[in-house]
């Protein structure tokens, strides 16, 4: 068998999903309540990076891009993450605030998909979170001009040591190019794997002040 033939065997990689179902009678009226329950269970199951989410944005040519970012806060106003404001995703969101998030909790056979709009956080919100980060992470935020091309990793490491020396006294200041976004939820879909590929999917869609809930075919 050639290497190419071996690679083609991925078509046969599959497993049954047997960890349980999701039924309408178990659904709360608010999607954030179910999200919180599932996130807590993901943390209790000791999944690697349970707050990791795929963030999808589009550029001015409608070309989609994805990357993994950590969720840092959520409440009834939305889901929050932080980033370099010079990054590609930040530029995308300045031009088009439409955004999609995905939480892939594979070990629990679950996914949560979110669509909505992103808006910049206030400087006060960003400052409060920034100073809660480990000091080296604060310095690291100063080092990288995110998404720019660099010649070698050594450039970053040298800059980090330089700034660590510079900021050795007192607080590390908040970079003007570092901030965050809040995603206001318009839709939230919960996916639970099921046997024979008969997965359970429920879509919460905002309907004025309430939420409309629909079961979707897998």
Swiss-Prot record:
GO molecular function: FMN binding; pyridoxamine phosphate oxidase activity
Protein's recorded name: Pyridoxine/pyridoxamine 5'-phosphate oxidase
Role, per record: Catalyzes the oxidation of either pyridoxine 5'-phosphate (PNP) or pyridoxamine 5'-phosphate (PMP) into pyridoxal 5'-phosphate (PLP).
Annotated gene: pdxH
Cofactor-binding details, from the entry: Binds 1 FMN per subunit.
EC number: 1.4.3.5
UniProt-listed NCBIfam families: pdxH (TIGR00558), PRK05679.1 (NF004231)
GO biological process: pyridoxine biosynthetic process
SUPFAM superfamilies membership: FMN-binding split barrel
Phylogenetic lineage: Bacteria, Pseudomonadati, Pseudomonadota, Gammaproteobacteria, Enterobacterales
Quaternary state and interactors: Homodimer.
PANTHER family reported for this sequence: PYRIDOXINE-5'-PHOSPHATE OXIDASE (PTHR10851:SF0), PYRIDOXINE-5-PHOSPHATE OXIDASE (PTHR10851)
Pfam families: PNP_phzG_C (PF10590), PNPOx_N (PF01243)
Family: Belongs to the pyridoxamine 5'-phosphate oxidase family.
Residues annotated for FMN binding in this entry: 67-72, 82-83, 88-89, 111, 146-147, 191, 201
Annotated residues for binding of substrate: 14-17, 72, 129, 133, 137, 197-199
Cofactor: FMN
Keywords noted in UniProt: Flavoprotein, FMN, Oxidoreductase, Pyridoxine biosynthesis
Pathway: Cofactor metabolism; pyridoxal 5'-phosphate salvage; pyridoxal 5'-phosphate from pyridoxamine 5'-phosphate: step 1/1; Cofactor metabolism; pyridoxal 5'-phosphate salvage; pyridoxal 5'-phosphate from pyridoxine 5'-phosphate: step 1/1
Reaction catalysis annotation: pyridoxamine 5'-phosphate + O2 + H2O = pyridoxal 5'-phosphate + H2O2 + NH4(+); pyridoxine 5'-phosphate + O2 = pyridoxal 5'-phosphate + H2O2
